Amino acid sequence: MIIIGRKSRNTDQALIKAGIELIAQGNYDPTVRAICTLANVNQGMFVYYFGFKEEYMKVLFQKIYEDYLSKLQDYPEKDAKAAIQLQQIFYRMTKYFIENFNTANFLTEALYHSKAASYFTNYRVQHFIFVRTLIEQAQREGDICSDMNSYEIYTTLQSILIQPIIIKNNIL
């Protein structure tokens, strides 16, 4: 009788958790060895689950981005006017970026500046579409000026959002 091994449900999650921890520490391009050491998993299991590091990084990014989106969308004022909802979302964005500075940097790098950015095209607009829809609704409700388009308003609000992060992390 031949016994074929089954994939453990926890090993792949341990590898993802290790990657998230390394990124939170500022290691945006962790080695397979570092990931496996932190996860207490041998490197053969890394290959078994993900094949190549590039595939692992895609899965890791997807997990981090989905967690970020869920934090943005999990606010108590969902029945409120759009302007109130925007206030809640930008508060959550600011809080996330301050509390998870290195992870936020990783997301920014992956979304816009990394060699892998093209893989994340489907993701990089989800948060923008979500916020832009609320901006346009707030404009229709008369709570936000209508002489600017939603992208201009989004980038203006985004620049305001970044100020507490710069101050807290002594970037300038």
Question: Residues of each region from the PLM?
Answer:
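N-terminal intrinsically disordered/low-complexity leader segments
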Residues: 1-10
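Generic hydrophobic, amphipathic alpha-helix propensity
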Residues: 10-19, 35, 60-64, 68, ...
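Helix-turn-helix
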Residues: 14, 22-55, 59
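Hydrophobic alpha-helical connector segments
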Residues: 73-102, 150-157
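Amphipathic alpha-helical segments used for helix-helix packing
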Residues: 97-116, 168-171
